[in-house]
Amino acid sequence: MTDEQQTPEEYGADSIKVLKGLEAVRKRPGMYIGDTDDGSGLHHMVYEVVDNGIDEALAGHADAVNVKIHDDGSISVSDNGRGIPVGIHEGEGVSAAEVIMTQLHAGGKFDSNSYKVSGGLHGVGVSVVNALSDYLELRIWRNGKEHYARFEGGFTVKHLEVVADCGDRTGTEVRFLASLDTFSNRDFYFETLEKRLRELAFLNSGVRIILTDERPAEHLVSELYYDGGVKEFVKYLDRSKTSILPEPIYVIGERDEIVVEVAMWWNDSYNEMVLPFTNNIPQRDGGTHMAGFRAALTRTINNYAQSSGIAKKEKISFTGDDAREGLTCVLSVKVPDPKFSSQTKDKLVSSEVRPAVENIMNEKLSEWFEENPQIARIVVSKIVEAAHAREAARKARDLTRRKTAMDVNFLAGKLKDCSEKDPSKTEVFLVEGDSAGGSAQTGRDRQTQAILPLKGKILNVERARFDRMLGSQEIGNLVMALGTGIGRDEFNIDKLRYHKIVIMTDADVDGAHIRTLLLTFFFRQMPQLIERGHLYIAQPPLYKVSRGKSEVYLKDQAAMNDYLTEQGVEGAMLRQGNGEEIGGADLRRVVDEAGRLKRVLDAFPTHYPRHILEQAAIAGAFVSGAVEADLQGVADKVAARLDLIANEWERGWQGRITQDKGIRLARILRGVEEVRTLDGPMMRSGEARKSGTFTQHLQDVYNTPATLIRKDRVQNIYGPLDLLKAVLEEGERGLSLQRYKGLGEMNPSQLWETTLDPDARTLLQVKVDDVAEADDLFTKLMGDVVEPRREFIQQNALNVENLDF
């Protein structure tokens, strides 16, 4: 341990202020870290640690953060900042680092000399990460020494000590394994972490963040570094849209220690996206910074339109909605002592932020318009179009309000309503086509279920202005049926007539297209329905299976496989090489285990043949520890297993160790050498580790060839994939299989039994976890620009299964 001398302004041990108590964290973790079941709290653990590194960058002491998901499920975060103070904390009698790790509300962010602004303190700090982890290892590089400490369950098990010299290196590394006592699972999602880390890289220009996932055989690495900051962020958000400006408008300024940074870019769409951040923390519900931005934007554009004569020429006034149509904006403020409406920090309520944002925006944006008159006119012209469209939409809406009794009767002829008037007890099915609508109308529960047939494909609202959308008959019928109205000023979710809105389309390409059109409509025009959990997608069955007089409906391929397995196991017996027989429920368990192994093997890169991976798993090639002890012995066993399953003239496999501690398998076949290699990194990957957990079971069942006996049929079984294939083939014998492509193929009673009956059906609730990513996806799929859509299809084509309709 090193004693430290510090000046009053220095970041040292005495900078750490303490507010005690950790037991409450373990008792009610959700209050401190978020939901412990849906994954958000688990990933928030990582963000807490990452934010400490980012705060070092904000203070000017770091420029690199590394996040690594290790193959054992733990995660490490390191930075090249100053390193957590290691001196003895005067008030606590232990190192400052241990105080930070074991005391709630302990850290340098309470001390204004250490950090002027910080985003990492979500009311908790890294001590909560420690409290909710099986173990946490801390390494600190400071004062030329490497320090190490270990904690378990939030308690110190190895006090901070010097373990090595480190030269000039400085920084901190935290590695932790989340506790299964707190979290229902501890599987980190690479994409979820990448999204948040990308935001941080954009918001902190010049900071390099590297995310590595060591779990797959081929490690995933994402390097996130953006010199352009929020300007690059806006370009990234608009990557699938067509901008009307050559470059984003960029504004930066400071007032009363509040730093305001804004990037704005208008595109040719009709949708607004403004992402507000305070000290790198996103505000889903906006706040005072958003209010200041909107007020300044509307005022500045109106002033420019007046002074340039555009407003007088066009004879129309602009609103804030007009100014923000097609706008993509990132608004980032750095505030010394921000105040939020809740622990989740979803809304900024610091009153001093609004005038700061408003003044900086007014001044800087006015200057920009004066200095760039040609581009300013492009922006104002776009806003003029929006204002004219708004006026046209108002007139169209007035016409809608003046609907006569005949119009309402026309809707009644389309909508087959239910008798229940309590919206919380009712549901409306949006059904593709009149024929399916007829079956649904006859088969439904008339008390609580309404049916609205949709004729043809509804309007693609991604490519249509609001006034044109209001002129669409199908959309008009839908809006009238729901009862909420439409548009920012008219929509009222309290008037929703059905609390379950169920999209029910065919299982073919047209059905998928109609479903996507409807999802686009709800996402763009009625997002509150998705946010409140009112939107669902029906899951009509994909198959009807008949055997004799019995009929079974199966909703998807997984249900089909389960059914075929049950049928194939019935009356079957697996006779092992030692003469023992497995049947009934025991055989079903063996087959299910084979299915689980197949899913693990399918996660390996496709260039590894599945039968070789299967035999390697049986031979024990993926068992941790055993492989390192006798790798050549394992290689010989794998070669012997491959000879076992080969025809006599195709044998001769030989195994040897490769330089990267993998296995090279080779044989001479018809004078040509065939080589297969199990790479060392692959054999130590997360997939290999999972495969190794099956080895004992595999050796118990498949160590010698077995036979599957069913009635008078006998099949040789050399491994779990053989068994799975044989059982599914047995299950298919004597079955008549019908694959439904349209709802109209089912009669009313079938539709009720499979899709409408609340006690038997399956519904998928529509949720949006990432608004920006969802916006980009809808733009790609439904927008005017072809190239991003082509790229999306090319990138995802290989992931499509069952493309047979």
Describe the residue ranges of each PLM region.
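Conserved phosphate-chemistry cores used by DNA topoisomerases
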Residues: 1-805
